[in-house]
Every structure is written in structure tokens, then in C-alpha cells.
């Protein structure tokens, strides 16, 4: 019975020492910026970014007019759609 109580006390001592070591290894943080309340502007804008809206008919028509000037873009427009063709040949849609 004595050995059991000694083993329990030793295990509690080891447990207390290791838990104190894990708390003391982390520095005390006093400023809210280091606690994660603030994020970088790029991260915040990617989280808050709105979903893209659907294009109106006049916007699609202006994309079609630009794409009709390039024969390869016009062929792709007929098979893949105006948005895919425009973004492939001219980059992101400006509006």
C-alpha cells in the first residue's frame, strides 16, 4: 500500500511539473494584436470578399463584341461560352 501511494504521489508530481513547463514555455501575451483579434488586410479582404454578381445582358454583349474581333476567341465562345472565352484570351472580366 505504501508503494502505491508513493507511485501516485510521484506521478502527480511529474504531471504537475510537466503541465507547469508547458505553461511557462509560452510567453505571456498582453496585446490584443498578438492574441489573434486582428488579421492582415489581405486575409480580411479574402474573407469578406463578396460573391461575384451575374453579368447583365449589356455587359455580356460588350464582352461578345470584344471577343468577336479575335477568330480563336469567337470559336471558343461558340463552344465554351462567352465568359470562358473572354477570360482565356483577355484575362479577368473588368466589371
From Swiss-Prot:
A molecular-function term among this protein's GO annotations: structural constituent of bone
S-S pairs: 67-73
One GO biological process term: type B pancreatic cell proliferation
Residues that coordinate or bind Ca(2+) 1: 68
UniProt keyword annotation of ATP-binding present: no
Gene Ontology CC annotations of this record: extracellular region
Residues carrying 4-carboxyglutamate: 61, 65, 68
Residue ranges of the propeptide: 22-50
Signal peptide: 1-21
UniProt xrefs under PANTHER family: OSTEOCALCIN
Family: Belongs to the osteocalcin/matrix Gla protein family.
Protein name: Osteocalcin 1
Source organism of the structure: Solea senegalensis (Senegalese sole)
Amino acid at each position: 500500500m505504501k508503494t502505491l501511494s508513493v507511485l501516485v504521489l510521484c506521478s502527480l508530481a511529474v504531471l504537475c511539473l510537466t503541465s507547469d513547463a508547458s505553461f511557462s514555455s509560452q510567453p505571456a501575451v498582453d496585446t490584443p494584436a498578438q492574441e489573434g483579434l486582428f488579421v492582415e488586410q489581405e486575409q480580411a479582404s479574402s474573407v469578406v470578399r463578396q460573391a461575384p454578381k451575374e453579368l447583365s445582358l449589356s455587359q455580356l454583349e460588350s464582352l461578345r463584341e470584344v471577343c468577336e474581333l479575335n477568330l480563336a476567341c469567337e470559336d471558343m465562345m461558340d463552344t465554351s461560352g462567352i465568359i470562358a472565352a473572354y477570360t482565356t484570351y483577355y484575362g479577368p472580366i473588368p466589371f
